[in-house]
């Protein structure tokens, strides 16, 4: 409890107003991102671990949400590392993954029903089923000759189905799991998909826009290759901070009702959200100078 009480804004409003360089804003943003990651750790510990911090046995429905929270933690720590190493291009890629994981987690928490979580699992097994069918076709074309790598792949696929409590015959080529756009619109609004998620697709797929902005330099009537990493600026961290705090808050409300520690964590989310808004506002003013 004391450790959670100690999660406080690093700088006061007056100190932020006196920032005279972007490095100072970056320091504040990085420390805030760390605190949001710590809050995710805290709710995971409250819900899925024993008093000693050892993970408890959980059922499949719990594992769907809990596993997504762990993915969110791992993505955030990798994001933080690349921020500190000054690798903006990698940050763009991880940022997109953070967004989709947060969307999935919030959707699963809001919908909450067993069928929704089952559709989430079933949808991920479609690709595995397609690979299984490709192997079967290839083996048939070779008159039943199975390659060692195909045997290993089939064992791996069967293992995934067994752990997920699905039979191969249950999974078809279509799924009732909503598209990422529909999930994003439901939990974050239409602008989120178009602006935050959609634009970040450039970095994931290596579209021309990503190549142009991050990997080339325009010179006169041609280009030069850009071998240097681009330096992250505070704005790249905004999305992760907002999403992390949103997920922590809704998780506490849905999964940790009447827990006094969870109530304190919700208060911390509000405090850090207000602090982030203050940072953002002052950084915007600073950029206009």
Q: Where on the chain are the PLM-derived regions?
A:
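Long, hydrophobic/aromatic-enriched structural stretches that serve as scaffold segments
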Residues: 43-108
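Short amphipathic alpha-helical surface patches that mediate protein-protein
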Residues: 96, 121-122
């Amino acid at each position: 409890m004391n450790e959670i009480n100690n999660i406080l804004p690093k700088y006061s409003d007056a100190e932020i107003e006196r920032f005279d360089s972007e490095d100072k804003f970056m320091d504040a943003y990085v420390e805030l991102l760390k605190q949001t990651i710590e809050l995710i750790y805290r709710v995971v510990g409250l819900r899925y671990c024993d008093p000693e911090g050892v993970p408890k046995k959980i059922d499949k429905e719990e594992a769907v949400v809990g596993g997504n929270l762990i993915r969110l933690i791992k993505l955030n720590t990798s994001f933080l590392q690349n921020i500190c190493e000054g690798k903006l291009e990698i940050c763009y890629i991880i940022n997109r993954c953070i967004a989709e994981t947060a969307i999935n987690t919030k959707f699963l928490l809001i919908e909450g029903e067993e069928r929704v979580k089952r559709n989430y699992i079933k949808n991920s097994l479609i690709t595995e089923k397609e690979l299984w069918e490709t192997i079967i076709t290839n083996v048939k074309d070779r008159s039943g000759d199975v390659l060692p790598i195909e045997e290993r792949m089939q064992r791996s696929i069967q293992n995934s189905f067994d752990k997920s409590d699905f039979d191969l015959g249950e999974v078809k080529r279509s799924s009732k799991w909503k598209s990422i756009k529909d999930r994003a619109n439901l939990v974050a609004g239409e602008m989120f998909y178009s602006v935050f998620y959609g634009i970040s697709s450039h970095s994931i797929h290596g579209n021309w826009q990503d190549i142009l902005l991050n990997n080339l330099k325009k010179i006169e009537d041609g280009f030069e290759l850009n071998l240097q990493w681009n330096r992250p600026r505070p704005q790249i961290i905004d999305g992760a901070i907002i999403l992390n705090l949103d997920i922590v808050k809704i998780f506490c409300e849905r999964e940790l009702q009447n827990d006094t520690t969870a109530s304190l964590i919700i208060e911390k989310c509000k405090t850090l959200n207000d602090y982030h808004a203050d940072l953002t506002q002052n950084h915007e003013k600073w950029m206009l100078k």
